[in-house]
Curated annotation (Swiss-Prot):
Species the sequence originates in: Nandina domestica (Heavenly bamboo)
Role summary: One of the primary rRNA binding proteins, it binds directly to 16S rRNA where it nucleates assembly of the body of the 30S subunit. With S5 and S12 plays an important role in translational accuracy.
A Gene Ontology term for the protein's cellular component: small ribosomal subunit
InterPro entries hit by this protein: Ribosomal_uS4, Ribosomal_uS4_bac-type, Ribosomal_uS4_CS, Ribosomal_uS4_N, S4_RNA-bd, S4_RNA-bd_sf
Main location group: plastid
Any one Pfam family match given in the protein's UniProt record, by short name: S4
Name of this protein: Small ribosomal subunit protein uS4c
Domain (S4 RNA-binding) ranges: 89-149
Gene: rps4
Amino acid sequence: MSRYRGPRFKKIRRLGALPGLTSKRPTPGSDLRNQSRSGKRSQYRIRLEEKQKLRFHYGLTERQLLKYVRIAGKAKGSTGQVLLQLLEMRLDNILFRLGMASTIPGARQLVNHRHILVNGRIVDIPSYRCKPRDIITTRDEQKSRALIQNYLDSSPHEELPKHLTLHSSQYKGLVNQIIDSKWVGLKINELLVVEYYSRQT
């Protein structure tokens, strides 16, 4: 299944706010989650919607998300918590959380077009897994810096999560540590996502 490129407002009406996909939010009364035909959502539907929230927020294909779930399942600790950490530490998401891109698809485009460096080297893989002490900068070119400056100027200037530091005048971000679950940028019940996949096998 490919990455979603359809109407974004349609998705947030169905699933609620998806800040990684769009800065728009569902208007009061437009949220369809509580308007299912039966009047009551099944447990399967609830798990499916949580999975879809995760997929659309981070801009993943079904295959990519399944791969992350499997990696998280083999790691020590809570599968759901590890899954969120893996997704939050992706380079495209780190750029988004730093305010260097307005959405995760926008961040992915910056990476694909080779505007971004990690520790002084160009990285053009959006799924690159960032680590503590990584330094994220832009190429020293006018076009690259102009793109980032435009995003920084239009950023809502929300409080940065504790695992990141931004030096906006230098177009530089620092990864201080692995993200703590309370700083995840999406309201999600990750256990329902894990349950969804465990019941598919």
